[in-house]
Amino acid sequence: MTEKLREISLDTETTGFNADQGDRIVEIGCMELINKIPTGEKFHVYINPERIVPAEAIKVHGLDNQFLKDKPVFSQIARDFLGFIGSDPLVIHNAQFDMKFLNSELRRMGISALDNPVVDTLVMAQKMFPGKRVNLDALCRHFKVDNTNRTLHGALIDANLLSSVYLHLTGGPNHALDFGELEDAPGKQAPKKRLSRSMRTRVRTASPVK
């Protein structure tokens, strides 16, 4: 009997880029994957960040102060969030960013940092497609994942798209990798193309990113 591997595709939206300088999470979206396939089980919540959301951040995700003011604060949703992810691997695009914010929120509550294994799909894509643009939109275009509903960043939408991209990055349903379709990253010339031997990374305490 095949062993079931449970993973969680995860994304967050925030008030900015700097958790160390007081930026907070405003949305968490998670999708359950069993053997890389979404089950339909999800965790999704909007969060009152207990601070003003800057206009620059609102332009990214559309979550303004009026919308968020009556939403629960992180400490009110933490138990449900931790219960949903358990100790299973987290699949995140640019994992350092999200992990730093999640651990910052947990630290405010006196809870230790997450020690779940983390699969960083950004690292995977950079190794698969060196020198190419590998943001989520670029990968959706490359793998022909429909992202027409992604007019703004949204944690649940992005977690759902990421689950499809992850399936392709790990071999997909009989998917043949084509390295020629992605755009070159700015100022970079693609080196010789090769696949990495290991695509998994573990993050305990994230460092500043973006």
Model feature map: region roles:
Residues 1-116, 126-129, 138-152:
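Conserved non-catalytic scaffold segment of RNase H-like nuclease domains
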Residues 64, 73, 135, 203-210:
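General structural signal for secondary-structure boundaries
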Residues 89-92, 96, 101, 105-106, ...:
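Acidic, Mg2+-coordinating catalytic module of metal-dependent nucleases/exonucleases
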Residues 187-210:
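Acidic, Ser/Thr-rich low-complexity intrinsically disordered segments
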